[in-house]
Swiss-Prot record:
Source species: Methylococcus capsulatus (strain ATCC 33009 / NCIMB 11132 / Bath)
Keyword Cell cycle appears in the UniProt entry: yes
Site entry (Important for catalytic activity), positions: 169
InterPro entries tied to this protein: Beta_hexosaminidase_bac, Glyco_hydro_3_N, Glyco_hydro_3_N_sf, Glycoside_hydrolase_SF, NagZ_Beta-hexosaminidase
Annotated localization: Cytoplasm
Function, in words: Plays a role in peptidoglycan recycling by cleaving the terminal beta-1,4-linked N-acetylglucosamine (GlcNAc) from peptide-linked peptidoglycan fragments, giving rise to free GlcNAc, anhydro-N-acetylmuramic acid and anhydro-N-acetylmuramic acid-linked peptides.
Chief location: cytoplasm
Active site: 171 (proton donor/acceptor), 242 (nucleophile)
One of the GO BP terms on file: cell division
EC class of the enzyme, as a word: hydrolase
Gene3D superfamilies: Glycoside hydrolase, family 3, N-terminal domain
Name assigned to this protein: Beta-hexosaminidase
NCBIfam families hit by this protein: PRK05337.1 (NF003740)
Pathway(s): Cell wall biogenesis; peptidoglycan recycling
Length: 334
């Protein structure tokens, strides 16, 4: 899964899309100008690769890639911080609204919800986390994911097994979490366990080193992805690497080495962003590899369902009522 430089496909990007190892596209703000432009971009992508998964980070708050023509969603922390139990209804509404608006421009899924438990020390997570207790995170994330599914969108929990306990930003460094496995199982992993039991469709591991548990970060660790996630937690959904161009991934070697290590550890799809040369290097490294039947099945479940015509969505009472509820919630949170 790779990204694009701008709002239109370049010749190199068309070539990347047609590569047999390319399976997904991740979109950013630089790729978006308007809903009509996004519909045209998605249509062009689908004309080249009808099976291409199209994703975006669209959590709400400071991580919302599309703004103009989309409802501004509150940060995850607002739902329970401001509104208490009533926030769960708002979280479900926001999950539906986010998913419905994205599906209406052809995007399959958003990398959401964030399942990290905020410990008050991670600025890169911060208000992206729903709460500071696993029970509250679970309740709010469950509501948000329920809304997503009502709009035909699968959910992806991140950042396994929990990014909220470290100060470092894995975009810039490899943070180290020195807690024992028992501590993570009793706190940070609880939201993941709960949503896995409710058939969570996807998970994204963190680029964090849990040094007292394993010598490798989860994206490159068979222990984390196979022994813990697949076997102990019985997760049968898709595993997406976090961005392999991040500084936190450099421990695994060059781009090709990172890709191969992530696949060997158990990732179903590799994500690489902001570095076209990394995309080219990884596609070359994967030239002769084919996805396993299990990965193919798990990734197929990430395809968006119930495609919504955008004009029909904006004319619907369900959309108007949802927008009004979120606007009122945003006003009350200020």
């Amino acid at each position: 899964m790779f990204d694009l430089v701008g709002p239109r496909l370049s010749a190199d990007e068309r070539e990347f899309l047609c590569h047999p190892a390319a399976g997904g596209l991740i979109l950013f703000s630089r790729n978006y100008a308007s809903p009509d432009q996004m519909l045209a971009l998605v249509s062009e992508v689908r004309s080249l690769r009808p099976d291409m998964l199209i994703a975006v980070d669209h959590e709400g708050g400071r991580v919302q890639r599309f703004r103009e023509g989309f409802t501004r969603l509150p940060p995850a922390s607002a739902y329970l911080e401001v509104a208490g139990e009533a926030g769960l209804a708002a979280a479900e509404t926001a999950g539906w609204l986010m998913a419905a608006e994205l599906r209406a421009v052809g995007v399959d899924f958003s990398f959401a919800p964030v399942l990290d438990v905020d410990s008050g020390i991670s600025t890169v997570i911060g208000d992206r986390a729903f709460a500071r207790t696993p029970e509250e995170v679970t309740a709010a994330a469950r509501a948000f994911a329920t809304g997503m599914r009502r709009a035909g969108m699968a959910a992806v929990g991140k950042h396994f097994p929990g990014h909220g306990g470290v100060a470092g930003d894995s975009h810039l460094v490899l943070p180290e979490d020195r807690r024992e496995l028992e501590e993570l199982l009793a706190r940070d992993l609880l939201p993941f366990s709960a949503l896995i039991r409710e058939n969570l469709e996807g998970i994204m591991p963190a680029h964090v080193l849990y040094s007292r548990i394993d010598a490798r970060p989860p994206c490159f660790s068979p222990f984390w992805l196979q022994t813990i996630l697949r076997e102990r937690m019985n997760f049968d959904g898709a595993i997406f690497s976090d961005d392999l161009s991040m500084a936190g991934a450099a421990v695994a070697g060059d781009y090709a080495a990172r890709a191969l290590a992530a696949l060997e550890a158990g990732c179903d799809m590799l994500v690489v962003c902001n570095t076209p040369e990394a995309t080219a290097s990884i596609l070359e490294a994967l030239e002769n590899r084919t996805a396993s039947p299990g990965s193919t099945r798990r990734l197929a479940a990430m395809c968006g369902r119930s495609r919504i015509d955008r004009d029909a969505l904006l004319a619907s009472s369900e959309w108007r009522n949802a927008v009004d509820r979120i606007h009122s919630f945003n006003d009350s949170a200020q």
